[in-house]
Design a protein with these regions (language model features):
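Short alpha-helical transmembrane segments in multi-pass integral membrane proteins
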Residues: 1, 50-117, 163-219, 275-340
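Single conserved hydrophobic/aromatic residue that forms the stacking wall/gate
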Residues: 1-8, 12-13
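Transmembrane helical elements of multi-pass membrane transporters/channels
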Residues: 9-10, 111, 145, 178-182, ...
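Hydrophobic/aromatic end-of-helix segments at the C-terminal termini of transmembrane alpha-helices
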Residues: 10, 17, 88-91, 152, ...
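Interfacial/gating helices of multi-pass transporter permease domains
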Residues: 14-33, 100-104, 168-169, 210-217, ...
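Small-residue-rich hydrophobic transmembrane alpha-helices
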Residues: 22-82, 119-133, 137-138, 236, ...
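Transmembrane alpha-helical core residues of multi-pass small-molecule transporters
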Residues: 32, 76, 144-149, 174-182, ...
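Alpha-helical transmembrane segments of multi-pass membrane transporters
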Residues: 84-86, 137-166, 180-189, 305-309, ...
Length: 373
């Protein structure tokens, strides 16, 4: 969903705002991804606890986990807004001396991070719905956010109709408003459709043991998702010494990779609460069956992604830039890197299964082997 929004923004600005805008987005991406990793990772902890508790028949604790998780997610959003806005200028200077790129990056990221609390709360609701098995609700919610973002992009970027032309800032506002509409949808559904868990002030009294369980999955989950940001930042530093075009290529690749991973990630998201519920109910044989079925499905999806990258790499790169040299170099890079897609389906599925079982640390170890080694 996050990548889909970025794709919409970047396809609109690529010709009219220049490749500097693409470079700025590529440099901002690691911090933006890190902020999202914290929100999504902690949300995975919420979803896992809800599913395990419901599987064990403990609805009261599941409701406490949802309420605690929502409150803590809102707090995370406030901290992310402050921290990311303060860090971004110094972060951009590490990778470029181009004043225009730095200015574009700061303007875009400041607006995006002002919506951080909306985003963390939104993702918390998403994981609560997933934890109780309401996958269709989250799918529609993501579509609401995505479609509204795609519609708003050209209106705010180019100034169509009554809207002013805002350039890259318009892309950032469109992304933020997409998150707002997504959250509003979840709030409406929660009010009109009863869930197995209830959010209530009476559950806000701090439960240290429950909070510890949320973070025991949430922190490793966030680190799992943040590891690509660390890798991208390190690679950006190396590539910036050679050419700004290489930074653009890396940024495009990671967005394409995430987009291609979306179907597999969606299946893994569906697997987590099902595994957690059955684990809580003591159905261990069913847990194994769910894992192997998910692994096979993810493998097929990643094989298709590999074939696409091998056959039409130029067209994929051309979605983000019109620079012939960037497209030519990107084609070669994409064909080489996609060789690891199929193997990565094993680690992606294993991490999701371990998180669903509440074993966040083991999941983190698997991710560390994938990214750091």
């Amino acid at each position: 969903e996050i990548t889909t929004r970025l794709v919409g923004s970047e396809m609109c600005i690529r010709d009219r705002i220049s490749e500097n805008a693409m470079t700025a987005l590529s440099l901002v991406y690691p911090i933006q991804n890190f902020a999202n990793a914290i929100a999504i990772g902690f949300g995975i902890g919420i979803s896992a606890q809800i599913a395990i508790c419901l599987g064990a028949g403990n609805k009261e604790t599941a409701s406490k986990a949802a309420t605690h998780g929502l409150a803590l997610s809102a707090l995370h959003g406030v901290l992310l807004t402050i921290g990311c806005i303060l860090v971004m200028p110094g972060f951009l200077v590490l990778f470029t001396s181009d004043a225009d790129v730095i200015d574009l990056g700061i303007r875009y990221s400041t607006i995006v991070f002002l919506f951080a609390t909306i985003n963390t709360t939104n993702l918390s609701y998403e994981k609560i719905f997933q934890g109780v098995g309401k996958m269709k609700v989250t799918m529609i919610g993501l579509m609401v956010g995505c479609v509204s973002n795609i519609i708003l992009d050209p209106l705010l970027i180019f100034g169509i109709g009554p809207f002013p032309a805002m350039g890259i800032e318009g892309a950032a506002i469109a992304t933020g408003l997409g998150q707002v509409f997504n959250l509003v949808f979840y709030l409406i559904v929660y009010k009109i459709q009863p869930l197995q868990v209830r959010l209530s002030r009476k559950y806000l009294h701090p439960d240290k043991a429950l909070i510890a369980r949320l973070y025991s999955v949430g922190i490793p989950g966030a680190l799992n998702l943040a590891l690509p940001s660390v890798l991208v930042s390190a690679l950006n530093g190396l590539l910036a010494a050679y050419s700004q075009s290489y930074v653009v290529i890396l940024g495009i690749y990671y967005k394409l990779q995430t987009f291609l991973y979306l179907p597999a990630s969606g299946i893994v998201q569906g697997m987590r609460p099902v595994i957690g519920y059955n684990y809580g109910a003591g159905e261990h044989k069913r847990v194994k069956k769910i894992y192997y079925v998910t692994l096979c499905m993810s493998g097929v999806i990643m094989l298709v992604g590999t074939i696409i990258c091998l056959t039409v790499p130029g067209q994929l790169m051309g979605m983000f830039t019109t620079n012939p040299e960037t497209i030519a170099a990107g084609k070669t890079a994409l064909r080489i890197i996609c060789a690891g897609f199929l193997v990565s389906s094993v680690s992606v599925t294993a991490c999701g299964a371990l998180e669903g079982l509440g074993r966040g640390t083991a999941s983190l170890v698997v991710s560390l082997c994938r990214y750091l080694i």
